[in-house]
Amino acid sequence: MRWRKFILCAVGALLASCSSESASRPDAGEVDEISSSENPVSSEWQLFSSSSFTEESSSSLFVHHPGFDPCRFNFGAGWQTAHEDPAFYEGLDYISVWLGDNDFFNAFEARMFDVTRQVNATPMIYAYVIAEFGKDHGLADCDTKKDGAFVTPNHCTDGAELIRNYFQDSILYRYREYAAGFREHIEFFANQDPDTVQFIWLVEPDFYQYSYSGSVQASKSSDHGGFAQNGGGVPDSMMGVYFSQIVDTIKAYLPASKIAIDISPWVLDQEAWYSNFDLSKVDFASTSGGRTAATSEKIRAANAATWKGIADLLKRPVLADAGYDAGGHGTGYNKAWGKTENLNARIADGVIGVTQMDPDSLYHVRASIVRSELSPTVWCTEN
């Protein structure tokens, strides 16, 4: 792969010295085991690979095949209108897109999917439907401020009422439109079967904020203004029912999809919260908000939840994200999520991938350099 070596050398001054010897991979025995017996993640993945996109390190022991793989750490990037050139994503494992702000499947996500086929990446969906539907009805994000004061009404004051009034006929409708739209789009590809194409759906970031427990907790906190849901939060058990209906809707059109349940690090009783969900429908746990800590065992410094604690509790791999903050504003490439020592520490905690939402054009090169230095994941049944 002469072209790859040329790129690596060209950016060597910025990123790493270009050498004929790659760093040796840490011994798999150094990684603590986390039991995944209830829902092992490995064999069902049908990885999209092509020799034209296979990246081989200078060590003959490491070969990278693009496409999400539970046996190694995965690197993803957010889909942006400023970066629709396939070369920007070449060599990455997945591309993510946020859905929810339209009633219909549109060209933006269709173009994302097309690029995933060109670079052999897995499509990832941030399904932010409830919040975006709420914005269409005048609700702000809970942490939105104007002139130093929290904006109301917001998702922490009226989100639960929105769900009660519109879940079946509007919120699930959007999920049907998106999933059916992807299915119809895939059918245009002669060599793709919508029944086997694997997506990863990150279902409803901040789902907890609409619940009874979330409302009670928020009302006692100044972080989001001390707001409570008008009319009360949705009963926690019903939040689990709504989650299952969303998953079933997605899989009715895209049955090979993998599902991630949201992690809200501020939840006071994580075990009680997740007990409301049918975890047999869940393949991953995922963060949202982009301000997660690569350098710490805590997901966020201000909260008690840890990467390993969530992975152990759910017995599921964890997907992290970085490079954006409140309101989805990009903050650029997060360097901490590119350092070998940080990544290996998080791999040992059960983290299986990171989405850089606002990377630069050298991101895929950095990923190609660090891959051979990373431990295998603790979730791989083939280790």
Q: What do the PLM-derived regions correspond to, one by one?
A:
Residues 97, 272-301, 357-359:
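Aromatic- and acid-rich polysaccharide-binding/catalytic face
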